[in-house]
A protein has these predicted regions:
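Structured-RNA-binding interfaces characteristic of tRNA pseudouridine synthases
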Residues: 1-279
Length: 279
């Protein structure tokens, strides 16, 4: 018989390749990351588990550091939760860490901010291995112009021009802490840190910055588009394949682990593995 005790709350850090998933959130008849994680943890707990995530990523979007919490009466060592869940998860989803947290902790509401990275590969021929993990760009990109243009988005603004038409948020006001555009060889990465995001906000920003990088618009166009508060003035929504939930920030006192993927990222790309901390 499984050992049980008082209800406690656990947090886990999850990495996943979102290519074949219809997003994080559980949806009837669709393959989702939440469904896979809940089934795996329920097997370890020996009772149904419901997980709540820091961010609900869309179909095809990846995560290096998704954070989720769940409640359980099952008594298991942390290592048992991590390894046990991974034994029930598909190869494109992995739990890297687990920790017990206070019952007041909430993966989404306790978070102070989130960072996303949007990755573009600029080369003349389409990629094969990276086809579902980057946005392929045939033409050269002016990275400096993209970075210059992006600075107009820093601070608190109405991001109506960069929200999806179907976005259900009651307000378009969001605060962007930092946004950078960096390039190393064929790889270009947009990194944005904000308190919260609108539906498709990062991908719409990426699509607009790509127009600046390609020379189709001047850097000042981004500021003009932001001020217009009109979705039709911005660029197209960039493909989901290039987007990664990179980091979720919590109060330091909680000692939530950083992304397990940060060091391999630096080795593979030559770009910094860790984000600038705006706190």
């Amino acid at each position: 018989m499984s050992k049980t005790g008082p209800t406690r709350r656990l947090a886990v850090g999850i990495e996943y390749d979102g290519t074949r998933f219809a997003g994080w959130q559980q949806q009837p008849g669709l393959v989702t990351v939440q469904d896979a994680v809940q089934k795996a943890l329920s097997n370890v707990a020996d009772h149904p588990v419901t997980v709540t995530a820091a961010g609900r990523t869309d179909a095809g979007v990846h995560a290096c550091a998704q954070v989720a919490h769940f409640d359980t009466q099952a008594v298991r060592p942390i290592r048992g939760w991590v390894l046990g869940a991974n034994s029930h998860l598909p190869p494109d989803v992995s739990i890297h860490w687990g920790m017990e947290v206070d019952r007041t902790f909430h993966a989404r509401h306790t978070a102070q901010g989130r960072s996303y990275r949007y990755c573009m590969l600029r080369q003349g021929t389409r990629p094969a291995i990276l086809r579902d993990r980057v946005c392929w760009i045939r033409s050269p990109l002016d990275v400096e112009a993209m970075h210059e243009a992006a600075q107009a988005l820093v601070g608190e603004h109405d991001f109506t021009s960069f929200r999806a038409v179907e976005c259900q948020s009651t307000t378009a006001m969001r605060h962007v802490d930092t946004i950078t555009v960096r390039g190393d060889g064929p790889l270009v990465v947009i990194e944005i840190s904000a308190n919260a995001y609108l539906h498709h906000m990062v991908r719409n920003i990426a699509g607009s910055l790509l127009m600046v990088g390609a020379g189709e618009r001047p850097p000042g166009w981004i500021a003009e588009t932001l001020a217009a508060r009109d979705r039709t003035r911005a660029g197209v929504t960039a493909p989901a394949s290039g987007l990664y939930l990179w980091q979720v920030r919590y109060p330091r006192s909680l000692q939530v682990p950083e992304a397990a993927f940060s060091r391999p990222w630096a080795m593979i790309t030559g770009l910094p593995g860790e984000s600038a901390d705006p706190r």
